[in-house]
Amino acid sequence: MVTRTVLKAPALFCIYSSLNRGDTLQFLNKVDSYLLIRNEPITIDLSEVKVATAAASLLLFSMVNRAQLLLNEPNIVRFHFPNKDKNNEGHRYIVKTGLSRALNSGSLPKLDELVLDEQYFQSSSEPSTHLFSTIEMIQAKAKLNDEQLLLLSSGISEAMLNVSHHAYEHSDFASVNKSIGKRWWQCAWFDPNLDSTVFIIYDLGMGIFKSYAQYQGPSNFMQELQIIKEAFTLGNTRFGTPERGKGSEDIKAPI
């Protein structure tokens, strides 16, 4: 019989607020450690989560899904989800958003089904094809005009291409790239109440700081913040060529 460690998620699962960020990141680090360092099966208990914001949910999806794909073991993680009768608020955040389905999509065919069913949470390693399905999904609800659609398409395209061109360009990721591709995880939807479109993308590569600065040593928060600001300034690029470094403007333009 397989013994599983149970990891209980914090009730307020959020990285936006400094009040909840520490507990949430600590929990996510535990998940990652058990799966990819210890290679131990776990059960993630989300049953008492009251609030799960989009960014934190996406981080959880990415870490769980990466382990499922790399280990070729969809069932290395099991879940306790909120019960609608006992925890309706948590059920709305975890189940109704499709997060619960995404967390159980531990194979490439299952991930493809998320795209076909136009789920909020998706994953891909192919910018050329996934951009179109994402835009189609958003536009079906948002009904953007031509200018808005162009701005959004350009921004999302550049974000996806950044992952493909920069996030995993290091020898440390050679085996990962061969196994699951230069993969990202995303969450996208149109909110009719706010009349706004949301697109969040996350990868598990080296990060902007190391990619842009090609920095290998230890760093501090202010140093990383300054480099990220520089990387998102028009004309700056890790390649150092003047004709490049415009992609960050495409990403910022729809905001």
Task: State where each predicted segment sits.
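Internal, well-ordered alpha/beta segment that forms a basic, Gly-enriched binding/recognition surface
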Residues: 95-135
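Short helix/loop capping segments that flank catalytic or ligand/cofactor-binding pockets
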Residues: 104, 209-210
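Flexible ATP-lid and adjacent glycine-rich G1/G2 motifs of the Bergerat
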Residues: 140, 214-255
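Acidic ATP/Mg2+-coordinating residue in the GHKL
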Residues: 203
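Glycine-rich G1-box
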Residues: 206
